[in-house]
């Protein structure tokens, strides 16, 4: 008896880590239907674009990609085959009807809280009957419906614990595309984490739009992290993305007490001007952010700080931008992400007066990036001569080379056996670059944490 040919599934992921997680879970949902992942869209039976709506450029990329997909779909139809095209994620949530109007090649649209409905939507598309757009805000229903088993490759994995946002920063579409803040039950999270550890995952990154606002039936994020830290084989825990307003004392204490909680924290600030922060509805000041960083560093002196910045927000003058540079100099970031303000339809900031010229945005972004690059290089140079535990994840580009991650999230390159992949190994750092470190394997094991 011959086996049924596997159906080919191509997923292209745009945007944040949560979209990466969502794409993996879509594959899990579709696997029982016979779909297997392929690396290229040409010839695929099902193409899913998992989209990001944070910036205008990301949205336009989707429509551009759909033009290419339409041609592929036509070629497959001419050859007697069928390609089903789905748009998922935040653009789907925000512009579902517009997507289907602008691009008839799209067969179905599914928002980020409804991708568990993909099998039914695909069936409707094949029957050419029924609603083929789902943008429900039902995160609890989604997670209850997802398969318990995840198929992961590698020793690091993302794990969504919280979704949505109640902060309503005036520049941001997340509350409109992901809905309000919602937290998964801790038991469900622990079960998924244990299953990951059983598959050889050594490091998990807990995900949420406001992950430190996690509230799982009396569980704060700190309490959840302490619970997960007890799972055998799960040696490293990270989390992203955080809001300064929700950085509680218990979470700061966890950074100082738990060796499993990595000394790396991504804590967006966006701007250094209180006037701009107020216009953004950030609910913190530059000074309160700086004091918070000081408190975190008192608990964990070696912590590497990362941040997000937006330049050219409406009303930002030269003096406001200089205050952002001042904040960067005072805090000192190991890494950061910086962007020009992007006007998003429906957000309060899009209608604000004082929209900044694109050329001014570009000049400010260049200056900010230069300062941030200098700080990142300086942080990496400070690691030279130190020995640190590195979780090796994959083969390097050069023969005999393996690549892993430091506790501070830098890529670390070393010559070593592939047998070390999946292992945490002490490495003496001997060189640094902007984005990575180079080192040699130590023969002596690292001392146990005090």
From Swiss-Prot:
It is found in: Cytoplasm. Monomer. GO terms for molecular function: 4 iron, 4 sulfur cluster binding; metal ion binding; N6-isopentenyladenosine methylthiotransferase activity. InterPro entries: Elp3/MiaA/NifB-like_rSAM, Methylthiotransferase, Methylthiotransferase_CS, Methylthiotransferase_N, Methylthiotransferase_N_sf, MiaB_methiolase, rSAM, rSAM_horseshoe. Its cofactor is [4Fe-4S] cluster. Keywords: 4Fe-4S, Cytoplasm, Iron, Iron-sulfur, Metal-binding, S-adenosyl-L-methionine, Transferase, tRNA processing. PROSITE patterns: MTTASE_N, MTTASE_RADICAL, RADICAL_SAM, TRAM. [4Fe-4S] cluster 2 binds at residues 165, 169, 172. Residues 7-127 form the MTTase N-terminal domain. It catalyses: N(6)-dimethylallyladenosine(37) in tRNA + (sulfur carrier)-SH + AH2 + 2 S-adenosyl-L-methionine = 2-methylsulfanyl-N(6)-dimethylallyladenosine(37) in tRNA + (sulfur carrier)-H + 5'-deoxyadenosine + L-methionine + A + S-adenosyl-L-homocysteine + 2 H(+). Binds 2 [4Fe-4S] clusters. One cluster is coordinated with 3 cysteines and an exchangeable S-adenosyl-L-methionine. Its main location: cytoplasm. Belongs to the methylthiotransferase family. MiaB subfamily. The lineage of its organism: Bacteria, Pseudomonadati, Pseudomonadota, Alphaproteobacteria, Caulobacterales. Residues 151-378 form the Radical SAM core domain. One of its GO terms (cellular component) is cytosol. [4Fe-4S] cluster 1 binds at residues 16, 52, 90. Catalyzes the methylthiolation of N6-(dimethylallyl)adenosine (i(6)A), leading to the formation of 2-methylthio-N6-(dimethylallyl)adenosine (ms(2)i(6)A) at position 37 in tRNAs that read codons beginning with uridine. It comes from Caulobacter sp. (strain K31). Residues 381-443 form the TRAM domain. Its EC number is 2.8.4.3. This is tRNA-2-methylthio-N(6)-dimethylallyladenosine synthase.
